[in-house]
């Protein structure tokens, strides 16, 4: 038997805030009347995937690294300890590295903040933030294709207002390192967000891009298919975009929150490479595959941050 005496009533108020405009823009949130408890979920932006390299047929090449995923922080507070208005800045995801002949790194994401004033420069005013360091972008295949760094956990000073609540910081996940060998370098799910999978490398034959391996109710985000050989200019396929359980039409989900990165682009020895897949909120973009001279795939964009405030 289930007793519902202590379950929250229908007055629960959920508000969701997305990145918009400039990365330095702030929202304001006003505490509803009769609110007793406040839960805050604060997720930063994920890193963009690196672009894949390009070279003449038969030469070994490396795919771009996947972007890292952001850390996140949750906070649970008695509403009486919070001011009537708090301010929110939602981080943006990093751009993927440009494809073609540019062979560039992905950009880092940016942090998300919840503060008692519209500034992130006064540490004592910050209620919670998504992490200490933002998720890093994946390196280009021509720069060894390293995976983007994971967003680190936030360790706040005891002088912060956060001491009035229960705070749980969680680290992100490193992006996958760009491939050179035929076996795809896949991402294993380890938490709420994932890094991006890397782009495919090659010696003389096109290869499949890295995937994000599914588990339980989460499906696999499949890497882009392999392209052709030196005598076949079939392009590598683009990596798949993200899988997520959120948002829904009601801002609620039937499953736990989950945000995947993008998968890696496929490679082609004689043609253009596949692009990395785009990421869900806070996750890393997929790395671009490698291709013929000047035809490396671009990296996928990192997912924007997200702040969810629940009041009851």
Q: Could you tell me what each predicted segment is?
A:
Residues 1, 39-41, 259, 279-284:
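Short hydrophobic/aromatic-rich beta-strand motifs
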Residues 1, 5, 138-139, 194, ...:
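Viral virion structural and adsorption modules
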Residues 1-34, 39, 78, 160-166, ...:
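Enriched but not universal
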Residues 16, 20-32, 42-117, 140-155, ...:
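Glycine-rich strand-loop-strand elements at beta-sheet edges
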Residues 87, 126-129, 279-280:
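Structural motif
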Residues 119-129, 142-273:
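Acidic, glycine-rich loop-and-strand cores that form catalytic or ligand-binding grooves
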Residues 129-137:
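A short, sequence-level motif marking secondary-structure junctions
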């Amino acid at each position: 038997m289930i007793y519902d005496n202590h379950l929250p009533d229908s007055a629960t108020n959920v508000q969701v805030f997305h990145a918009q405009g400039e990365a330095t823009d702030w929202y304001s949130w006003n505490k509803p009347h009769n609110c007793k408890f406040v839960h805050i979920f604060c997720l930063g932006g994920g890193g963009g995937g690196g672009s894949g390299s390009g070279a003449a047929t038969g030469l070994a090449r490396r795919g771009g690294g996947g972007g890292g995923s952001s850390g996140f922080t949750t906070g649970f507070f008695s509403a009486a300890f919070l001011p009537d208005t708090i301010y929110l800045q939602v981080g943006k995801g990093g751009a993927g590295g440009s494809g073609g002949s540019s062979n560039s790194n992905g950009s880092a994401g940016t942090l998300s903040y919840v503060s008692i004033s519209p500034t992130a420069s006064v540490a004592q005013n910050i209620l919670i933030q998504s992490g200490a360091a933002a998720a890093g972008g994946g390196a280009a295949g021509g720069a060894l294709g390293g995976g983007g760094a994971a967003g680190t956990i936030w360790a706040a000073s005891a002088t912060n207002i956060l001491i009035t609540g229960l705070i749980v910081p969680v680290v992100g996940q490193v992006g996958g390192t760009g491939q050179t060998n035929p076996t795809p370098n896949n991402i294993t799910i380890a938490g709420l967000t994932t890094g991006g999978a890397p782009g495919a490398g090659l010696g003389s034959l096109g290869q499949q891009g890295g995937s994000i391996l599914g588990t339980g109710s989460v499906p696999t985000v499949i890497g882009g298919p392999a392209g052709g050989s030196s005598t076949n200019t079939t392009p590598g396929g683009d990596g798949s975009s993200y899988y997520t359980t959120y948002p829904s039409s009601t801002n609620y989900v039937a499953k736990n929150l989950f945000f995947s990165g993008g998968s890696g682009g496929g490679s082609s020895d004689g043609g253009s490479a596949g692009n990395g897949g785009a990421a869900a909120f806070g996750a890393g973009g997929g790395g671009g595959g490698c291709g013929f001279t000047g035809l490396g795939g671009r990296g996928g964009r990192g997912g924007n941050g997200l702040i969810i405030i629940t009041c009851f």
